[in-house]
Amino acid sequence: MEIHQITDFNAPELDVYARLTENQLVNRADPENALFVAESPLVIGRALDAGCAPVSFLMEQKHIEGKGAALLARCPDVPVYAAELDVLTQLTGFHLTRGMLCAMRRPKLRDPAVLLQDASRVAVLENVMNLSLIHI
C-alpha cells in the first residue's frame, strides 16, 4: 500500500479532492476519464462492490489502521493520501464526517435501449446538475 503524507496542498494529485468542480469531474469532453468522489466508507464499499475502479483515497490518518483498513486491503495498489483531520478540513474546505474520501472512475453510461426494454415506468429528469444526488 502506497501511503503519502500530505505536505503540499497544491499537489496536482489532490486536485480531485480540493479544486475540481463536479462538472470538471464528470468531464463530458473525455468520459473515459470522468471521476466521482465517494464520501464515506459505506459508499466507497458499495461503489467497489458495483465494480467502480478507485483512483486514490484521501483519508484521516487514524483510519488507515482503523475503519479504512478493510477498504484499503481491497485496493492494495491504489495510492492513499493521509493527514490529520484538521489538515484534511483545510484541504477540502469541509469537515470529513466519516474521515475518508475515494476518487473513483465514473462507470460508463448504460445503453438506454437496454435499460428501457423491460421498464414498466420511466421518469424523465431535467436540469439535473449533479447526477450522483439522484442515485442512478
Describe every region a protein language model picked out:
Residues 62-119:
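S-adenosyl-L-methionine/SAH cofactor-binding core of RNA-modifying enzymes
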Residues 134-136:
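Conserved small/polar residues in nucleotide/adenosyl-binding loops
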Residues 59, 104, 125:
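Short beta-strand/turn micro-motifs composed of small residues
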Residues 31-37, 122-132:
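Short, glycine-rich nucleotide/cofactor-binding loops
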Residues 41-42, 63-64, 107, 129-130:
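Short beta->alpha connector loops
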Residues 1-61:
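Boundary-proximal intrinsically disordered activation/regulatory segments immediately upstream
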Residues 12, 39, 83, 129-132:
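Short secondary-structure boundary/capping elements
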